[in-house]
Amino acid sequence: MQDNKDVFRRIERQYYRDRMGTLGLSTVEGMLLRWLGKQGQTRQEELVVQLVLDKGAVARALARLEELGLVERAVSDRCRREKLVSPTPEGLVLAGAIQQSVEEWNTVCFQGFSPQERALFTDLFTRITQNAMEYKQGEKEHG
């Protein structure tokens, strides 16, 4: 018997892989660009933490996004080891297309839900995500 979570995750991953592929991006590149489109200039390390991604994967994805002219990286004035990442105007346009894909996926997923059901789901899922992030942080701190 298949777990509904597993089925949902597979379908969602395929959806985003397909959508990002049509934009010429990997899913990680899409995640980063979407974040930068919403948040603006961000420390590279903050992207790792907020998106719960591997440092190496983030560095590789940002290097490719930089090659494509979608982001710019600069050394911070505060700390020479710290890199700041900003979306370019072209990156912001693509971030908008990525956000549209996210909204389309949400429309698919919440079809037939009342506003109250959607709000309840969002609240519960936010709490689940916070629990998972706290677990992950504890794992890092305690080995």
Language model feature labels by segment:
Residues 1-23, 139:
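N-terminal leader segment of winged-helix/HTH proteins
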Residues 9, 34-38, 99, 126:
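Short, locally clustered residues in the helix-turn-helix/winged-helix DNA-binding domain
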Residues 13, 63-126:
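Charged, amphipathic alpha-helical coiled-coil/dimerization segments
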Residues 21, 37, 52, 63, ...:
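Residue-level detection of the helix-turn-helix DNA-binding "recognition helix"
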Residues 39-43:
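Short capping segments at the starts of secondary-structure elements
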Residues 44-45, 56, 63, 83:
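Residues within helix-turn-helix
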Residues 116-143:
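C-terminal regulatory/oligomerization modules of transcriptional regulators
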